[in-house]
Amino acid sequence: MTKPTDTDHPTESPVGFAANPAAMSDPLNLVRARAAIDEASVKTASTSLVEYRSSGNCLVIANGSDADAIDQALQCVAAMSDLSSWILCPGNTAEQPRPPRELTEQGVVIFHRQLLKLQGHLGQFDVQVAALGENPSAEHLGVIATTETGLFDLVLDLGGTATIDVQLPPFGYIHADNPDAVENACAQLSEMVGEFQKPKYFDYQQTLCAHSRSQLNGCSNCLDVCATGAISSITDGIEVDPFLCQGCGHCATVCPSGAMTYAYPSPATAIDSSRDLLNSESQAVLGIFLYPVTDEEEAGDAGDTVDALLPDHVLSIAAEETGAFGIDYWASMIAAGVRKICVLQHASDDAQSTVAGPGDLALVEQASMLNQILHALGLPENMIEILPSLNDTVLAGLTEKYQCESADHPLAGIPAASFSLHNDKRATLRAAIDHLRDHLPDNAVKHIDLPDGSPFGRLSIDNQGCTLCMACVSTCPAGALLDGQSVPQLRFIEANCLQCGLCSEACPENVLDREPRYLFDSVDARQAQILNEEEPFNCIVCHKPFATRKMIDNMSGKLSEHWMFQESKALRRLKMCEDCRVKDIFTESESGIDVHQKPKQPS
């Protein structure tokens, strides 16, 4: 079986502010030729391309095994005459038993097998069906159908329920459950033959990821919002399938550490390009309207509609995925002097396409969190507003949303920030907020409490229960928890804390609790604070400090009833360092301790 490769073709890609016309005119936002990407006029940082290869081997999954379902599937095969098609009827009842495989007069092979699993993407769909006989194993239908790779390139699912049930199904798979959808699906699949390319939309740094450490579970934000099922959990991190990823960008927006970043365009490119657009306008830009487009024609139509309704001081920016622009981008624009940002999630007002998914809801939560931080600085409420769709109500109220021209506005007279922090999400956000705090008069606020799930905060600790075992330090992925090096201390840097919860999971004493908040003073936030410290315990022989007194006392108390520590000399060894303990054992007896021999019990 041949697997398409994630090729490392560097390309200067345009998506973000002027969507690629060639990519958007393609049936599934895929590009057939590299040249189509290189022609773009708006440049961003290099990214790689993901390649798909389709030979046109299509599997049609019928809606049952009765005559009507088979007839519908055969009509689809006829409509896709340019493809090599097979039909799978997953229902084969005892009342109407059918042979496992039959050939129609038109030469179409129909399989009557139980469908167990369907996974993959354009050019590589693996279809597993139940094996014949009493053996409950699975067989690969592509191998039975003798396709070249043992896989199917395309799948048309006519069943009542989608076999691949995700918000954004993979390229090459279409679920159609009504006549119009079936007709459109046949037309689209017929065009999906050949080689296709799309950008690799993401960059992932495992070392920054707070998903898991040492088989402990922490942050799962990206998994919770992924609309394609492209993200999966692995040991000490996550894994993203670039062939399933469709670039919605929500994973990067909700990532607390910046381990997941959007690459098409990168955050730094998006911020710099937006600043250039702000500076290129003949008059001051006080508002931004960020809206999604899927093709060049739609971009023009939507832009004309929006621009006709927006005041002159508002800049409309077209983006292929508005969900990829998160709190670091919004805060940077506010620091650049923008007084209102509206983000449109869906270009269409169609009820089915505007159903709020986990990513849409997460975007609203991110905006709400940043609005709380900005309002605490004395700025107006709801400076960032998420709009679900461009319906009549939204259109009618656009002008009112951007009534921010007042000379008394808190941002009036504040210089525009122009920092660049090279895709460091947390540093970018803090730099933007620091800039606002330095120039706003109402900057006496020390901190603001945030809702659960926020990526900023501190830790509270039960000092009486903490033994300074440092399990939390070894687990923290962000360097927020530190040991005292030569002294028994637990230190904490609030600016680094992701509130991922890995430290709480690792703590054997359950003494750590998270307190989400934003600390405005960056000096204090970056200063290491002592959470707990104990008196060091010195070895009773060599006097070297090797533990804390509390740890030795706890250990002595817990082991005092154990049969191996019934003699005073055994308990005494607990108060020795590792070197002196070994010396003492072999000094006392040449044979050492027989750990298998229990002392005699008193009669």
Could you describe each region identified by the protein language model?
Residues 77-81, 303-315:
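Short helix-loop-beta junction
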Residues 314, 321-335:
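Non-catalytic interaction/regulatory modules that flank or connect domains
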Residues 128, 329-386:
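Cofactor-cradling patches in redox/metallo enzymes
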Residues 262-282:
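A contiguous, basic/glycine-rich beta-loop/short-helix subdomain that forms a polymer-engagement track
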Residues 1-37, 232-269:
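Helix-enriched interaction subdomains in cytosolic or periplasmic regions
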Residues 2-224, 283-298, 375, 381-482, ...:
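Ferredoxin-type iron-sulfur electron-transfer modules and their immediate structural context
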Residues 84-87, 317-318, 340-345:
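Short hydrophobic alpha-helical runs that function as membrane-insertion/retention elements
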Residues 202, 217-241, 246, 250-268, ...:
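Iron-sulfur cluster-binding cysteine motifs and their immediate structural context
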